[in-house]
Every structure is written in C-alpha cells, then in structure tokens.
C-alpha cells in the first residue's frame, strides 16, 4: 500500500508523499 501524504515526517527526510514498494518521494523538511 501507499503511505498517505504527510506520513512519516522527519527532520532529515521531510514528508513522504508516496511510498509504494521501492518507489517513494520525500519533500524537503519544512523550516
């Protein structure tokens, strides 16, 4: 399944918007 937007937020990786299998995209952390 896919992780919902805003899930798994960390200071280092930011917020992941998609996580399906090996494909994932993370936005930069908010200042």
From Swiss-Prot:
It is found in: Secreted. The modification 4-hydroxyproline is found at residues 28-29. Keywords: Disulfide bond, Hydroxylation, Ion channel impairing toxin, Knottin, Neurotoxin, Secreted, Toxin, Voltage-gated sodium channel impairing toxin. The keyword Disulfide bond applies. One of its GO terms (molecular function) is sodium channel regulator activity. It comes from the Eukaryota. GO terms for cellular component: extracellular region. Disulfide bonds join 2-16, 9-20, 15-26. Confined to the epidermis and to the mucus layer. Negative results: does not show effect on rat Nav1.8/SCN10A. Toxin with similar potency against both insect and mammalian sodium channels (Nav). Delays the inactivation of most Nav channels tested (B.germanica (BgNav1); EC(50)=87.2 nM, human Nav1.1/SCN1A; EC(50)=125.8 nM, rat Nav1.2/SCN2A; EC(50)=97.9 nM, rat Nav1.3/SCN3A; EC(50)=127.7 nM, rat Nav1.4/SCN4A; EC(50)=1150.3 nM, human Nav1.5/SCN5A; EC(50)=149.2 nM, mouse Nav1.6/SCN8A; EC(50)=1361.8 nM, human Nav1.9/SCN9A; EC(50)=1296.7 nM). Inactivation is completely prevented by a concentration of 1 uM, resulting in sustained, non-inactivating current. The presence of a 'disulfide through disulfide knot' structurally defines this protein as a knottin. Belongs to the nemertide family. This is Nemertide alpha-2. The lineage of its organism: Eukaryota, Metazoa, Spiralia, Lophotrochozoa, Nemertea.
């Amino acid at each position: 399944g896919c992780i919902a937007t805003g899930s798994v937020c960390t200071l280092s990786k930011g917020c992941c918007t998609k996580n399906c299998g090996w494909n994932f995209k993370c936005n930069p952390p908010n200042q």
